[in-house]
UniProtKB/Swiss-Prot annotation:
It is found in: Cytoplasm. One of its GO terms (cellular component) is cytoplasm. Its EC number is 2.8.1.10. The lineage of its organism: Bacteria, Pseudomonadati, Pseudomonadota, Alphaproteobacteria, Hyphomicrobiales. CDD domains: ThiG. This is Thiazole synthase. Keywords: Cytoplasm, Schiff base, Thiamine biosynthesis, Transferase. GO terms for biological process: thiamine diphosphate biosynthetic process.
Amino acid sequence: MVKFYDREFGSRLLIGSALYPSPAIMQDSIRESGAEIVTVSLRRETAGGKAGDQFWSLIRELGVTVLPNTAGCRGVRDAVTTAKLARELFATSWIKLEVIADNDTLQPDVVGLVEAAQILIKDGFEVFPYCTEDLSVAMRLVDAGCRVVMPWAAPIGSARGITNRDALKLLRDRLPDITLVVDAGLGAPSHAAEAMELGYDAVLLNTAIAKAEDPVAMARGFKLAIEAGRTGFEAGLMGARDFASPSTPVIGTPFWHAVS
């Protein structure tokens, strides 16, 4: 089980709802992933009108928990306003907080992110902040009241996997009581397994599944990889070595020498 604020979930995979080839494939992919939390963008999905009604109907049919996000917001005021609208629409205090600094890299504006988190937490929100892998930023978010932190592995949609393993490991080591979710930049199931082997509590995926040749099959692949990575972490991974170490010990006399 993984805990997000005061709620527990069985799946360690959070999944996005954008970019799929069709609404039906989106539904099937989410089901196959086993995800219980689905992120939705207030700015990029139409909440009203015929298309919006169809989209929300499909999400409701899945019986999942909706995590609204502030994707596309470029400043503190924009992010805070969007979060408040999301709370009214979805009747939830949860918000995946994104404050973007640059359109080319979609890198988080970490200064604005911390400020927006402080404002929203004081207003009763439970914030899921999308941030870089910088420890000082993560600690400021925790000090602001965030009990979940979501560092990127690489820029959104890049599919590069974990580019700064040491920094992500440091976050896990220094924030043992915080729910940590790798968010953005994963492109293959092996990337998700690596994140879980580092001890991360969950991963959030969208593009890697939605843009696969077979999104439904890829959703299952990520589900299995996350389970495998978490199992490996809990089992206790052996440490890496600089030199070889024999797997079969040499003890006593070879058995063929012992035969008279």
